């Protein structure tokens, strides 16, 4: 039977100094021998998804203490991708994931904590904490801050729903008046919480449910709603139970690697494809799987993408539905219920509540449950009041959306598309694959061929798009923006949004070894691997080269002969130490980012560190 990790610092005369310091934090004799549980918070006033988390750590801690544990809270950093977008700040976003994972490991191992409750929410914070949890493999429960309410405003005598992306598009559209742009900007992000669409933050919080590491409702219940408080209270109680099960009963089923098994990862990716989640989730699931020592690769994702239909469509792929609507339709478990009935899930998995998938669906799938409290929870809706306070309202929808023929969530028979919301493409300049969010691609451009317009930075591409140099039919190629080449693998939300604002959203393609915001839609293909800075063929594309994209057949091709590609590769190598670097880009890169780049792998590996360079 494993002994509590914390006993290392709380037992024995030689630990008198450590105990003295523990006492200075408020611990007493009666606390030594109890499990020490880290409450890993991520409160910050920089990020709307985290601005309301300050007191929620205390809420969890109080429940831990009441249940027989000792709670110790610490904070991680949190980058707001939307605020960091469109300038040099975006270079720091993806690297912050590694810093978060490392900081959690450092704090938990340095102080010998026995278990964790991770209070996350936004884009890199949930993945970073997930990576740390699977790396450490001690009992853990995730409880996130919850989604933002959708913005709403009246345009042309019609009430429309809004989000961050609408503000960006309207702000760059020369045809939109200053008054209308200002109106949209002021209405787009009305409350605390993670941005209201199926962007990266909400996608990842949904996936922690599918992995079994968070409670039902975690991915979709609004940040502002009073019902969300119960998730935090339950997490504090449940983590003590899980911790005692492992340390006192030698029950390894309480450990995250046994909950988030390969079968659970396959279920999470199946959910992701069915709900048209952010392409960033691919990057983060691949990274998390490596931390869990699970053999889960782009090949597995490709296989799933070929058989899983799209059963849910949410902003940015449509303005009709946002996360508040997904919740009304049954949330993550509403989608999983339909996938289960279609025979597309592994049923032999459990969650942090100790329930198998069939047991969870029986209790929480709104189409089958007899539990009125569950139905009431899924009727939790928006209040439409600007606020930065968690749990500040208790409004409810009059009814649930259980219409699986024409509602937000569909059954297999009435799927939005027989093809899922994400696809992996392969070709002669994406030998290791690339990702497209098919949920956001118009049917008219699922097959697309055009001449390349090549840019070696996001900034140059934006200038060209807004300057009218990109025209209908072009394939915009932005390279040297991968994990190593950026460095930091910037999101390309501004280029894709500006294509829309210039009327080219359905008339152009954009391809990059960088990545996209969860708010991106359109024919936007990212994560091209190998990246340009790692010798990828994307570095050899020239202006005017023809690129053919065929999403139904999962193909992307540079229409050049092998001989021509080989000749260009030879010319690139002849540049010596300048080979596989941008020719004319002026970018200041800090030593911190250079350190990140020196170990970064391409996107097909999750952009994690190259362990071979560290002797691992």
Curated annotation (Swiss-Prot):
Pfam families xref list: ILV_EDD_C (PF24877), ILVD_EDD_N (PF00920)
The reaction(s) this protein catalyses: (2R)-2,3-dihydroxy-3-methylbutanoate = 3-methyl-2-oxobutanoate + H2O; (2R,3R)-2,3-dihydroxy-3-methylpentanoate = (S)-3-methyl-2-oxopentanoate + H2O
Co-factor binding comment: Binds 1 [2Fe-2S] cluster per subunit. This cluster acts as a Lewis acid cofactor.
Positions bound to Mg(2+): 81, 123-124, 491
Keyword annotations of the record: 2Fe-2S, Amino-acid biosynthesis, Branched-chain amino acid biosynthesis, Iron, Iron-sulfur, Lyase, Magnesium, Metal-binding
Major enzyme class: lyase
Entry's EC annotation: 4.2.1.9
Family as reported in the entry's similarity comment: Belongs to the IlvD/Edd family.
Subunit structure: Homodimer.
Alphabetical list of NCBIfam families matching this protein: ilvD, PRK12448.1
Function as written in the Swiss-Prot or TrEMBL entry: Functions in the biosynthesis of branched-chain amino acids. Catalyzes the dehydration of (2R,3R)-2,3-dihydroxy-3-methylpentanoate (2,3-dihydroxy-3-methylvalerate) into 2-oxo-3-methylpentanoate (2-oxo-3-methylvalerate) and of (2R)-2,3-dihydroxy-3-methylbutanoate (2,3-dihydroxyisovalerate) into 2-oxo-3-methylbutanoate (2-oxoisovalerate), the penultimate precursor to L-isoleucine and L-valine, respectively.
Protein name: Dihydroxy-acid dehydratase
Protein's organism: Salmonella heidelberg (strain SL476)
């Amino acid at each position: 039977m494993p002994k509590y990790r914390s006993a290392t610092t709380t037992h024995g005369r030689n630990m008198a100094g450590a105990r003295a310091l523990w006492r200075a934090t408020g611990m007493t004799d009666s606390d030594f021998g109890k499990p020490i549980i880290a409450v890993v918070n991520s409160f910050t006033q920089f990020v709307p998804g985290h601005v309301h988390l300050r007191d929620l750590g205390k809420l969890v801690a109080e429940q831990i203490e009441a249940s027989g544990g000792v709670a110790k809270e610490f904070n991680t950093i949190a980058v707001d991708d939307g605020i960091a977008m469109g300038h040099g700040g975006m270079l720091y976003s993806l690297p912050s994931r590694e810093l978060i994972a490392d900081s959690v490991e450092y704090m938990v191992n340095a102080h010998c904590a026995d278990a964790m409750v991770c209070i996350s929410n936004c884009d890199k914070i949930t993945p970073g904490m997930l990576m740390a949890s699977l790396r450490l493999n001690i009992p853990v429960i995730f409880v996130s801050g919850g989604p933002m309410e959708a913005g709403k405003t009246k345009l042309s005598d019609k009430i429309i729903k809004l989000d961050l992306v609408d503000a960006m598009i309207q702000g760059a559209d020369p045809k939109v008046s200053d008054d209308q742009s200002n109106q949209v900007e002021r209405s787009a992000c009305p409350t605390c919480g993670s941005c209201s669409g199926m962007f990266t933050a909400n996608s990842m919080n949904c996936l922690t449910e599918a992995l079994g590491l968070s409670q039902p409702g975690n991915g979709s219940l609004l940040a502002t709603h009073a019902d969300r408080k119960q998730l935090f209270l339950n997490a504090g109680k449940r983590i003590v139970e899980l911790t005692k099960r492992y340390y006192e009963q030698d029950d390894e089923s309480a450990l995250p690697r046994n909950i988030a098994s390969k079968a659970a990862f396959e279920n999470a990716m199946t959910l992701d494809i069915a709900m048209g989640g952010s392409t960033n989730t691919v990057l983060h699931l691949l990274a998390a799987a490596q931390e869990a020592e699970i053999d889960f690769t782009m090949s597995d994702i490709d296989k799933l993408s070929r058989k899983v239909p799209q059963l849910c469509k949410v902003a940015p792929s449509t303005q009709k539905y946002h996360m508040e609507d997904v919740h009304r339709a049954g949330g993550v478990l509403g989608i999983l219920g339909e996938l289960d009935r279609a025979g597309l899930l592994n049923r032999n998995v459990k969650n942090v509540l100790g329930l198998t998938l069939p047991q969870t669906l029986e209790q929480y799938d709104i189409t089958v449950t007899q539990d009125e409290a569950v139905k009431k929870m899924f009727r939790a809706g928006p209040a439409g009041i600007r606020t930065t306070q968690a749990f500040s309202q208790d409004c409810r929808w009059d009814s649930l959306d259980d219409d699986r023929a024409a509602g937000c969530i569909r059954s297999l028979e009435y799927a939005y598309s027989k093809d899922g919301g994400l696809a992996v493409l392969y070709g002669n300049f994406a030998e290791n694959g690339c990702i497209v969010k098919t949920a956001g691609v118009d049917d008219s451009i699922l097959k697309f061929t055009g001449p390349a317009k090549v840019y070696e930075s996001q900034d140059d591409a934006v200038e060209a798009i807004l300057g009218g140099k990109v025209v209908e039919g072009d394939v915009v190629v932005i390279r040297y923006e991968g994990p190593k080449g950026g460095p930091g693998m910037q999101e390309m939300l501004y280029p894709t949004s500006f294509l829309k604002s210039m009327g080219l959203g359905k008339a152009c393609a954009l391809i990059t070894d960088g990545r996209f915001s969860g708010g991106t839609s359109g024919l936007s293909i990212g994560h091209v691997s190998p990246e340009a800075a790692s010798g990828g063929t994307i570095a050899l594309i020239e202006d005017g080269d023809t690129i053919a994209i065929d999403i139904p057949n999962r193909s992307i091709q540079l229409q050049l002969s092998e001989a021509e590609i080989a000749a260009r590769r030879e010319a690139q190598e002849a540049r010596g130490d300048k080979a596989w670097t941008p020719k004319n880009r002026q970018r200041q890169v800090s030593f911190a980012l250079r350190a990140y780049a020196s170990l970064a792998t391409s996107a097909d590996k999750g952009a994690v560190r190259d362990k071979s360079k560290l002797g691992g």
